[in-house]
Protein backbone atom coordinates (compact mmCIF):
# COMPACT_ATOMS: atom_id res chain seq x y z
CA UNK A 1 0.00 0.00 0.00
CA UNK A 2 1.34 3.43 -0.99
CA UNK A 3 2.33 5.58 1.97
CA UNK A 4 1.16 9.18 2.29
CA UNK A 5 4.85 10.04 2.70
CA UNK A 6 6.10 7.49 0.13
CA UNK A 7 7.09 9.71 -2.80
CA UNK A 8 10.82 9.49 -2.07
CA UNK A 9 10.82 5.69 -1.69
CA UNK A 10 11.14 2.99 -4.34
CA UNK A 11 10.16 0.15 -1.98
CA UNK A 12 7.47 -0.21 0.64
CA UNK A 13 8.32 -1.43 4.16
CA UNK A 14 7.97 -5.08 5.02
CA UNK A 15 4.76 -5.96 6.80
CA UNK A 16 6.50 -6.60 10.11
CA UNK A 17 8.33 -3.28 9.81
CA UNK A 18 4.98 -1.53 9.45
CA UNK A 19 3.66 -3.37 12.47
CA UNK A 20 6.72 -2.61 14.57
CA UNK A 21 6.69 1.08 13.70
CA UNK A 22 2.95 1.69 13.93
CA UNK A 23 1.44 3.43 16.95
CA UNK A 24 -2.23 3.41 15.97
CA UNK A 25 -2.96 0.62 18.47
CA UNK A 26 -2.51 3.15 21.29
CA UNK A 27 -2.43 6.68 19.88
CA UNK A 28 -6.00 6.23 18.64
CA UNK A 29 -6.74 7.45 22.18
CA UNK A 30 -5.92 10.88 20.76
CA UNK A 31 -8.59 10.76 18.05
CA UNK A 32 -10.76 13.53 19.53
CA UNK A 33 -7.76 15.75 20.21
CA UNK A 34 -6.33 15.12 16.74
CA UNK A 35 -9.57 16.12 15.02
CA UNK A 36 -10.02 19.11 17.34
CA UNK A 37 -6.53 20.34 16.50
CA UNK A 38 -7.21 19.88 12.79
CA UNK A 39 -10.42 21.91 13.01
CA UNK A 40 -8.49 24.80 14.56
CA UNK A 41 -5.70 24.45 12.00
CA UNK A 42 -8.19 24.57 9.12
CA UNK A 43 -9.88 27.67 10.56
CA UNK A 44 -6.49 29.34 10.88
CA UNK A 45 -5.56 28.44 7.29
CA UNK A 46 -8.78 30.08 6.11
CA UNK A 47 -8.10 33.21 8.18
CA UNK A 48 -4.65 33.47 6.63
CA UNK A 49 -5.96 33.00 3.06
CA UNK A 50 -4.33 29.61 2.59
CA UNK A 51 -7.71 27.86 2.37
CA UNK A 52 -10.77 29.40 0.78
CA UNK A 53 -13.95 29.65 2.82
CA UNK A 54 -15.48 26.89 0.70
CA UNK A 55 -12.48 24.62 1.19
CA UNK A 56 -12.45 25.18 4.93
CA UNK A 57 -16.17 24.46 5.14
CA UNK A 58 -15.81 21.13 3.34
CA UNK A 59 -12.84 20.17 5.51
CA UNK A 60 -14.70 21.20 8.66
CA UNK A 61 -17.78 19.21 7.70
CA UNK A 62 -15.62 16.19 6.91
CA UNK A 63 -13.76 16.43 10.22
CA UNK A 64 -17.00 16.83 12.17
CA UNK A 65 -18.36 13.73 10.47
CA UNK A 66 -15.26 11.82 11.55
CA UNK A 67 -15.54 13.23 15.07
CA UNK A 68 -19.13 12.04 15.32
CA UNK A 69 -18.13 8.60 14.10
CA UNK A 70 -15.31 8.55 16.64
CA UNK A 71 -17.74 9.34 19.45
CA UNK A 72 -19.93 6.48 18.23
CA UNK A 73 -16.95 4.13 18.06
CA UNK A 74 -17.52 3.69 14.32
CA UNK A 75 -14.03 4.53 13.02
CA UNK A 76 -11.86 1.66 11.84
CA UNK A 77 -8.15 2.31 12.14
CA UNK A 78 -5.49 0.60 10.05
CA UNK A 79 -1.88 -0.21 10.83
CA UNK A 80 -1.17 0.57 7.16
CA UNK A 81 -1.48 4.26 8.07
CA UNK A 82 0.82 4.02 11.08
CA UNK A 83 -0.65 6.53 13.49
CA UNK A 84 -3.70 8.55 14.39
CA UNK A 85 -2.69 11.47 12.17
CA UNK A 86 -2.33 9.56 8.91
CA UNK A 87 -5.39 7.45 9.67
CA UNK A 88 -7.52 10.57 10.12
CA UNK A 89 -6.00 12.20 7.04
CA UNK A 90 -6.77 9.11 4.93
CA UNK A 91 -10.33 8.98 6.29
CA UNK A 92 -10.79 12.68 5.54
CA UNK A 93 -9.58 12.21 1.96
CA UNK A 94 -11.97 9.28 1.58
CA UNK A 95 -14.76 11.47 2.98
CA UNK A 96 -14.27 14.70 0.96
CA UNK A 97 -11.75 13.84 -1.76
CA UNK A 98 -8.24 15.16 -2.51
CA UNK A 99 -9.05 18.43 -0.72
CA UNK A 100 -8.46 16.55 2.51
CA UNK A 101 -4.76 16.43 1.68
CA UNK A 102 -4.61 20.22 1.76
CA UNK A 103 -5.27 20.27 5.51
CA UNK A 104 -1.68 19.35 6.29
CA UNK A 105 -0.41 22.61 4.78
CA UNK A 106 1.83 24.49 7.20
CA UNK A 107 2.16 21.73 9.77
CA UNK A 108 3.97 18.45 10.43
CA UNK A 109 3.02 15.37 12.37
CA UNK A 110 5.69 16.54 14.81
CA UNK A 111 3.79 19.62 15.94
CA UNK A 112 0.49 17.83 15.39
CA UNK A 113 1.21 15.05 17.89
CA UNK A 114 2.63 17.49 20.43
CA UNK A 115 -0.56 19.53 20.13
CA UNK A 116 -2.68 16.42 20.59
CA UNK A 117 -0.88 15.52 23.81
CA UNK A 118 -1.14 19.04 25.19
CA UNK A 119 -4.89 18.94 24.54
CA UNK A 120 -5.17 15.45 26.04
CA UNK A 121 -3.43 16.38 29.27
CA UNK A 122 -5.24 19.69 29.47
CA UNK A 123 -8.55 17.80 29.55
CA UNK A 124 -7.44 15.02 31.86
CA UNK A 125 -5.52 17.13 34.37
CA UNK A 126 -8.65 19.23 34.78
CA UNK A 127 -10.60 16.04 35.44
CA UNK A 128 -8.00 14.77 37.91
CA UNK A 129 -8.25 18.03 39.85
CA UNK A 130 -12.02 17.54 40.06
CA UNK A 131 -11.52 13.97 41.29
CA UNK A 132 -9.06 15.14 43.96
CA UNK A 133 -11.60 17.67 45.18
CA UNK A 134 -14.29 14.97 45.33
CA UNK A 135 -11.94 12.80 47.39
CA UNK A 136 -11.17 15.75 49.67
CA UNK A 137 -14.90 16.30 50.18
CA UNK A 138 -15.30 12.64 51.16
CA UNK A 139 -12.49 13.01 53.69
CA UNK A 140 -14.09 16.12 55.15
CA UNK A 141 -17.45 14.37 55.48
CA UNK A 142 -15.89 11.39 57.24
CA UNK A 143 -13.75 13.65 59.43
CA UNK A 144 -16.75 15.74 60.53
CA UNK A 145 -18.38 12.58 61.85
CA UNK A 146 -15.23 11.59 63.75
CA UNK A 147 -13.81 14.70 65.40
CA UNK A 148 -14.08 13.12 68.86
CA UNK A 149 -13.28 9.60 67.69
CA UNK A 150 -9.88 8.86 69.16
CA UNK A 151 -7.35 6.24 68.15
CA UNK A 152 -3.65 5.68 68.73
CA UNK A 153 -1.34 7.72 66.57
CA UNK A 154 1.72 5.80 65.45
CA UNK A 155 5.42 6.28 64.90
CA UNK A 156 7.53 3.33 63.70
CA UNK A 157 4.15 1.53 63.53
CA UNK A 158 4.19 1.57 67.35
CA UNK A 159 1.47 3.31 69.35
CA UNK A 160 2.74 6.78 70.18
CA UNK A 161 0.07 9.31 71.23
CA UNK A 162 -3.73 9.36 71.08
CA UNK A 163 -5.15 11.52 68.30
CA UNK A 164 -8.48 12.42 66.74
CA UNK A 165 -9.42 10.22 63.79
CA UNK A 166 -10.56 13.38 62.00
CA UNK A 167 -7.05 14.76 62.47
CA UNK A 168 -5.63 11.65 60.84
CA UNK A 169 -8.00 11.91 57.88
CA UNK A 170 -7.23 15.61 57.44
CA UNK A 171 -3.53 14.82 57.18
CA UNK A 172 -4.36 13.19 53.84
CA UNK A 173 -6.62 16.11 52.92
CA UNK A 174 -3.62 18.45 53.06
CA UNK A 175 -1.37 16.03 51.17
CA UNK A 176 -4.02 15.94 48.46
CA UNK A 177 -4.25 19.73 48.54
CA UNK A 178 -0.56 20.00 47.68
CA UNK A 179 -1.04 17.38 44.97
CA UNK A 180 -3.88 19.45 43.56
CA UNK A 181 -1.75 22.61 43.65
CA UNK A 182 1.00 20.84 41.71
CA UNK A 183 -1.46 19.78 39.01
CA UNK A 184 -2.95 23.28 38.91
CA UNK A 185 0.49 24.83 38.53
CA UNK A 186 1.42 22.36 35.79
CA UNK A 187 -1.39 23.76 33.64
CA UNK A 188 0.86 26.75 32.95
CA UNK A 189 3.15 24.42 30.99
CA UNK A 190 0.43 22.19 29.56
CA UNK A 191 -1.65 25.09 28.29
CA UNK A 192 0.79 26.09 25.54
CA UNK A 193 0.41 25.44 21.83
CA UNK A 194 3.12 23.85 19.66
CA UNK A 195 0.81 23.90 16.62
CA UNK A 196 2.54 25.58 13.70
CA UNK A 197 6.08 24.72 14.81
CA UNK A 198 6.25 22.40 11.81
CA UNK A 199 8.74 19.56 11.68
CA UNK A 200 11.31 21.61 13.60
CA UNK A 201 11.92 24.98 11.92
CA UNK A 202 8.48 26.49 11.45
CA UNK A 203 6.94 27.00 8.01
CA UNK A 204 7.19 29.32 5.03
CA UNK A 205 3.40 29.70 4.92
CA UNK A 206 1.99 32.89 6.46
CA UNK A 207 0.22 31.15 9.34
CA UNK A 208 -1.11 32.69 12.56
CA UNK A 209 -0.07 30.46 15.46
CA UNK A 210 -1.63 32.73 18.05
CA UNK A 211 -5.01 32.39 16.36
CA UNK A 212 -4.97 28.59 16.31
CA UNK A 213 -3.80 28.62 19.94
CA UNK A 214 -6.72 30.87 20.86
CA UNK A 215 -9.20 28.58 19.09
CA UNK A 216 -7.87 25.62 21.07
CA UNK A 217 -8.06 27.46 24.38
CA UNK A 218 -4.31 27.65 24.90
CA UNK A 219 -2.88 30.59 26.84
CA UNK A 220 0.27 30.97 24.74
CA UNK A 221 2.42 29.42 22.02
CA UNK A 222 5.83 27.80 22.24
CA UNK A 223 8.38 30.51 21.51
CA UNK A 224 10.86 28.13 19.87
CA UNK A 225 9.87 25.63 17.20
CA UNK A 226 12.62 23.16 18.12
CA UNK A 227 11.48 23.19 21.72
CA UNK A 228 7.82 22.91 20.78
CA UNK A 229 8.14 19.67 18.82
CA UNK A 230 10.87 17.89 20.75
CA UNK A 231 10.44 18.32 24.49
CA UNK A 232 8.11 16.29 26.64
CA UNK A 233 8.75 17.98 29.96
CA UNK A 234 5.05 18.76 30.29
CA UNK A 235 4.33 15.01 30.23
CA UNK A 236 7.18 14.30 32.62
CA UNK A 237 5.81 16.92 35.00
CA UNK A 238 2.40 15.26 34.81
CA UNK A 239 3.94 11.85 35.48
CA UNK A 240 5.95 13.26 38.39
CA UNK A 241 2.89 14.91 39.92
CA UNK A 242 0.94 11.70 39.43
CA UNK A 243 3.69 9.69 41.11
CA UNK A 244 3.54 12.02 44.11
CA UNK A 245 -0.23 11.69 44.30
CA UNK A 246 -0.09 7.91 43.98
CA UNK A 247 2.55 7.77 46.72
CA UNK A 248 0.08 9.51 49.05
CA UNK A 249 -2.72 7.17 48.00
CA UNK A 250 -0.42 4.19 48.52
CA UNK A 251 0.44 5.28 52.06
CA UNK A 252 -3.24 5.71 52.85
CA UNK A 253 -3.97 2.33 51.25
CA UNK A 254 -1.43 0.68 53.54
CA UNK A 255 -3.23 2.11 56.56
CA UNK A 256 -6.62 1.02 55.24
CA UNK A 257 -5.24 -2.49 54.79
CA UNK A 258 -3.90 -2.53 58.35
CA UNK A 259 -6.99 -0.97 59.91
CA UNK A 260 -9.40 -3.50 58.44
CA UNK A 261 -7.27 -6.48 59.48
CA UNK A 262 -8.35 -8.68 62.38
CA UNK A 263 -5.32 -7.41 64.29
CA UNK A 264 -6.63 -3.81 64.23
CA UNK A 265 -10.37 -3.93 63.41
CA UNK A 266 -10.44 -0.11 63.35
CA UNK A 267 -12.61 -0.03 60.21
CA UNK A 268 -14.63 -2.32 58.00
CA UNK A 269 -14.75 -1.83 54.26
CA UNK A 270 -18.09 -1.97 52.53
CA UNK A 271 -18.71 -5.22 50.64
CA UNK A 272 -18.67 -3.26 47.38
CA UNK A 273 -14.98 -2.41 47.89
CA UNK A 274 -13.76 -5.83 49.04
CA UNK A 275 -13.42 -9.31 47.56
CA UNK A 276 -13.39 -12.87 48.83
CA UNK A 277 -11.26 -15.96 48.44
CA UNK A 278 -11.90 -18.83 46.03
CA UNK A 279 -10.80 -21.26 48.75
CA UNK A 280 -11.30 -19.66 52.16
CA UNK A 281 -14.98 -18.77 52.69
CA UNK A 282 -14.38 -16.45 55.65
CA UNK A 283 -12.10 -14.02 53.81
CA UNK A 284 -12.92 -10.38 53.13
CA UNK A 285 -9.92 -8.90 51.37
CA UNK A 286 -9.12 -5.18 50.89
CA UNK A 287 -8.22 -5.76 47.24
CA UNK A 288 -8.98 -2.23 46.04
CA UNK A 289 -6.59 -0.70 48.56
CA UNK A 290 -4.00 -3.33 47.68
CA UNK A 291 -4.40 -2.62 43.97
CA UNK A 292 -3.94 1.11 44.48
CA UNK A 293 -0.80 0.37 46.48
CA UNK A 294 0.40 -1.93 43.70
CA UNK A 295 -0.52 0.39 40.83
CA UNK A 296 1.63 3.09 42.39
CA UNK A 297 4.64 1.12 41.20
CA UNK A 298 3.49 1.10 37.59
CA UNK A 299 3.01 4.89 37.68
CA UNK A 300 6.57 5.25 38.97
CA UNK A 301 7.60 3.00 36.07
CA UNK A 302 5.77 5.17 33.54
CA UNK A 303 7.63 8.22 34.82
CA UNK A 304 11.07 6.60 34.85
CA UNK A 305 10.44 5.09 31.42
CA UNK A 306 9.94 8.49 29.81
CA UNK A 307 12.84 10.05 31.71
CA UNK A 308 15.03 7.27 30.33
CA UNK A 309 13.72 7.77 26.79
CA UNK A 310 14.35 11.53 26.90
CA UNK A 311 17.81 11.57 28.45
CA UNK A 312 19.78 10.95 25.25
CA UNK A 313 17.65 12.60 22.56
CA UNK A 314 19.23 15.36 20.46
CA UNK A 315 17.04 18.10 19.00
CA UNK A 316 14.59 17.87 17.45
CA UNK A 317 12.07 15.07 16.89
CA UNK A 318 13.17 11.43 17.10
CA UNK A 319 11.09 8.29 16.62
CA UNK A 320 11.88 7.40 20.24
CA UNK A 321 9.19 9.92 21.15
CA UNK A 322 6.56 7.54 19.86
CA UNK A 323 7.13 5.78 23.19
CA UNK A 324 5.96 8.81 25.20
CA UNK A 325 2.26 8.01 24.97
CA UNK A 326 1.50 4.60 26.44
CA UNK A 327 2.89 5.55 29.85
CA UNK A 328 0.91 8.78 29.78
CA UNK A 329 -2.32 6.99 28.88
CA UNK A 330 -1.64 4.34 31.52
CA UNK A 331 -0.99 6.90 34.24
CA UNK A 332 -4.10 8.91 33.40
CA UNK A 333 -6.25 5.78 33.59
CA UNK A 334 -4.57 4.61 36.80
CA UNK A 335 -4.78 7.95 38.62
CA UNK A 336 -8.37 8.63 37.65
CA UNK A 337 -9.44 5.11 38.60
CA UNK A 338 -7.57 5.17 41.91
CA UNK A 339 -9.14 8.46 42.96
CA UNK A 340 -12.64 7.28 42.08
CA UNK A 341 -12.18 4.00 43.95
CA UNK A 342 -10.65 5.62 47.02
CA UNK A 343 -13.42 8.22 47.26
CA UNK A 344 -16.09 5.53 47.32
CA UNK A 345 -14.07 3.39 49.72
CA UNK A 346 -13.85 6.25 52.25
CA UNK A 347 -17.50 7.22 51.86
CA UNK A 348 -18.79 3.71 52.54
CA UNK A 349 -16.38 2.35 55.16
CA UNK A 350 -17.56 1.76 58.73
CA UNK A 351 -15.50 3.28 61.54
CA UNK A 352 -15.34 1.08 64.64
CA UNK A 353 -15.15 3.93 67.14
CA UNK A 354 -15.25 1.75 70.25
CA UNK A 355 -12.39 -0.41 69.02
CA UNK A 356 -10.29 2.67 68.29
CA UNK A 357 -11.08 4.13 71.71
CA UNK A 358 -10.27 0.89 73.50
CA UNK A 359 -6.92 0.73 71.73
CA UNK A 360 -5.92 4.05 73.33
CA UNK A 361 -6.52 2.55 76.77
CA UNK A 362 -4.48 -0.58 76.24
CA UNK A 363 -1.11 0.96 75.63
CA UNK A 364 1.26 3.60 76.96
CA UNK A 365 0.45 6.34 74.44
CA UNK A 366 -0.46 8.58 77.41
CA UNK A 367 3.11 8.46 78.76
CA UNK A 368 3.99 11.75 77.08
CA UNK A 369 1.18 13.39 79.05
CA UNK A 370 2.86 12.32 82.30
CA UNK A 371 6.20 13.75 81.21
CA UNK A 372 4.54 17.02 80.16
CA UNK A 373 2.66 17.06 83.49
CA UNK A 374 5.90 16.96 85.46
CA UNK A 375 7.60 19.47 83.15
CA UNK A 376 4.76 21.95 83.67
CA UNK A 377 5.38 21.65 87.42
CA UNK A 378 9.00 22.69 86.98
CA UNK A 379 10.87 19.41 86.46
CA UNK A 380 13.31 19.53 83.52
CA UNK A 381 11.76 17.58 80.65
CA UNK A 382 14.70 15.17 80.36
CA UNK A 383 14.34 14.28 84.04
CA UNK A 384 10.57 13.92 83.62
CA UNK A 385 11.18 11.64 80.64
CA UNK A 386 13.38 9.42 82.82
CA UNK A 387 10.84 9.26 85.64
CA UNK A 388 7.97 8.30 83.35
CA UNK A 389 10.11 5.80 81.46
CA UNK A 390 10.76 3.94 84.71
CA UNK A 391 7.04 3.98 85.53
CA UNK A 392 6.28 2.47 82.13
CA UNK A 393 8.86 -0.25 82.74
CA UNK A 394 7.28 -1.03 86.12
CA UNK A 395 3.85 -1.32 84.48
CA UNK A 396 5.17 -3.65 81.79
CA UNK A 397 6.79 -5.84 84.43
CA UNK A 398 3.49 -6.09 86.32
CA UNK A 399 1.22 -6.41 83.27
CA UNK A 400 -0.75 -3.23 83.97
CA UNK A 401 -1.17 0.20 82.37
CA UNK A 402 -0.36 3.62 83.79
CA UNK A 403 -4.01 4.29 84.60
CA UNK A 404 -4.00 1.13 86.77
CA UNK A 405 -1.06 2.20 88.92
CA UNK A 406 -1.90 3.14 92.54
CA UNK A 407 -1.48 6.82 93.37
CA UNK A 408 1.08 6.06 96.07
CA UNK A 409 3.46 4.62 93.52
CA UNK A 410 3.20 7.77 91.43
CA UNK A 411 4.20 9.83 94.47
CA UNK A 412 7.10 7.49 95.17
CA UNK A 413 8.34 8.30 91.68
CA UNK A 414 7.87 12.05 92.20
CA UNK A 415 6.15 14.17 94.83
CA UNK A 416 5.03 16.47 92.00
CA UNK A 417 2.31 13.96 91.11
CA UNK A 418 -1.12 14.84 92.49
CA UNK A 419 -4.45 13.04 92.31
CA UNK A 420 -5.40 14.88 89.11
CA UNK A 421 -2.91 12.60 87.39
CA UNK A 422 -5.68 10.15 86.49
CA UNK A 423 -7.49 12.89 84.59
CA UNK A 424 -4.29 13.58 82.67
CA UNK A 425 -4.04 9.90 81.77
CA UNK A 426 -7.47 9.90 80.11
CA UNK A 427 -6.91 9.69 76.31
CA UNK A 428 -9.63 12.30 75.67
CA UNK A 429 -7.80 14.71 77.93
CA UNK A 430 -4.57 14.05 76.08
CA UNK A 431 -6.21 14.84 72.75
CA UNK A 432 -8.23 17.82 73.93
CA UNK A 433 -5.20 19.56 75.44
CA UNK A 434 -3.21 19.54 72.19
CA UNK A 435 -3.96 23.19 71.59
CA UNK A 436 -1.12 24.22 69.28
CA UNK A 437 -2.00 25.26 65.74
CA UNK A 438 -2.26 22.24 63.49
CA UNK A 439 -2.52 19.88 66.45
CA UNK A 440 -5.03 17.16 67.23
CA UNK A 441 -7.03 19.07 69.86
CA UNK A 442 -10.75 18.95 69.15
CA UNK A 443 -11.02 22.73 68.72
CA UNK A 444 -8.02 22.77 66.42
CA UNK A 445 -9.53 19.97 64.34
CA UNK A 446 -12.83 21.85 64.07
CA UNK A 447 -10.94 24.91 62.84
CA UNK A 448 -8.98 22.78 60.38
CA UNK A 449 -12.23 21.34 59.04
CA UNK A 450 -13.63 24.81 58.41
CA UNK A 451 -10.47 25.80 56.56
CA UNK A 452 -10.54 22.58 54.55
CA UNK A 453 -14.15 23.18 53.52
CA UNK A 454 -13.30 26.73 52.48
CA UNK A 455 -10.41 25.42 50.37
CA UNK A 456 -12.66 22.98 48.52
CA UNK A 457 -15.33 25.62 47.99
CA UNK A 458 -12.79 28.09 46.57
CA UNK A 459 -10.85 25.48 44.60
CA UNK A 460 -7.63 26.72 46.17
CA UNK A 461 -6.28 27.47 49.65
UniProtKB/Swiss-Prot annotation:
Under Gene3D superfamilies, the record lists: Fumarase/aspartase (C-terminal domain), Fumarase/aspartase (Central domain), Fumarase/aspartase (N-terminal domain)
What this protein is called in its record is Argininosuccinate lyase
Q: In which pathway does it act?
A: Amino-acid biosynthesis; L-arginine biosynthesis; L-arginine from L-ornithine and carbamoyl phosphate: step 3/3
Q: Which InterPro entries match?
A: Arg_succ_lyase_C, Argininosuccinate_lyase, Fumarase/histidase_N, Fumarate_lyase_CS, Fumarate_lyase_fam, Fumarate_lyase_N, L-Aspartase-like
Which transformation does this protein catalyse, written as a reaction?
2-(N(omega)-L-arginino)succinate = fumarate + L-arginine
User: Per the record, GO CC terms?
Assistant: cytosol
UniProt source species: Bacillus subtilis (strain 168)
Name the family the entry cites.
Belongs to the lyase 1 family. Argininosuccinate lyase subfamily.
NCBIfam families recorded for this chain? argH (TIGR00838)
Entry's localization field: Cytoplasm
| EC number assigned by the record | 4.3.2.1
- Keyword Cell cycle: yes or no? no
Name the keywords, alphabetized: Amino-acid biosynthesis, Arginine biosynthesis, Cytoplasm, Lyase
Keyword Amino-acid biosynthesis on this protein? yes
* UniProt xrefs under Pfam families: ASL_C2, Lyase_1
PANTHER family in the record: ARGININOSUCCINATE LYASE
Please name the GO terms of the biological process aspect recorded for this protein, alphabetically: arginine biosynthetic process via ornithine; L-arginine biosynthetic process
A molecular function (GO) held by this record is: argininosuccinate lyase activity
Signal sequence residues: none
